[in-house]
Amino acid sequence: MATGKPVVMIVMAGRPLTIGRQVDQAAAVLYAFHGGTMAGPALCNILTGKVVPSGKTPITFPKMVGQIPLYYNRHNTGRPSYDPPMLIDSIPIGCPQFSIGQSSYWLETPTEPLFPFGFGLSYTTFEYGSTRIDTLPFREGQGVGYSLSCTITNTGSYDAYETPQLYVRQLSGDLVRPLCELKGFQKIFIPAGETREVIFTITDDDLGYWHESHDGLSSRVWFATDDVDFRFAILPYSQSL
């Protein structure tokens, strides 16, 4: 690296590692996990450009060990975060404490991971359109259904696969719900310069969760969907909605 020649770092591991310092020094990172007996030819095809990479991270990569446990579908703390952190030397002398941004983290570490869940780069680029939602006819035993769609354009120079992901956030409810939840994904092939439409279908059951109550002597468990507002988005990787 001291010579200035670009270096591609290949990581073979079965779990996310804290590799922030190495990522800063490498020109690119290829996380191979445990690729099996054909890992060598597969990596060679990616590095030489025979194959355009299309993998997505199935886990969240932390910036540091202190962030663990770290997961995309965490609960909301109800407190705002401030990213990047406010440096103490940049705070004016004598200012009231509330002027520094009311910063608070859900963990006492940076708020963002090194690589979020569902993230992955390609040799090409993709542009996502707005998510559209349509209500489907009521079906006995399934309740109301919803069709969610968006267009994805390959704006780069290479034919490639992309994996759009459907995320849902429940804005209120009987219990605190995650900031976002993965409800579906698809892998689609999009030639360079072309546009494809991706469609997801979900029902009321896909938006429900398990409830539990106790009265001191017994407990009751049931599955239900809250009659509240939801937010939907088709995204290239997990983001807070």
Each model region followed by its residue ranges:
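Secreted, periplasmic, or luminal enzymes acting at the cell surface/secretory milieu
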Residues: 12, 16-161, 167-169, 212, ...
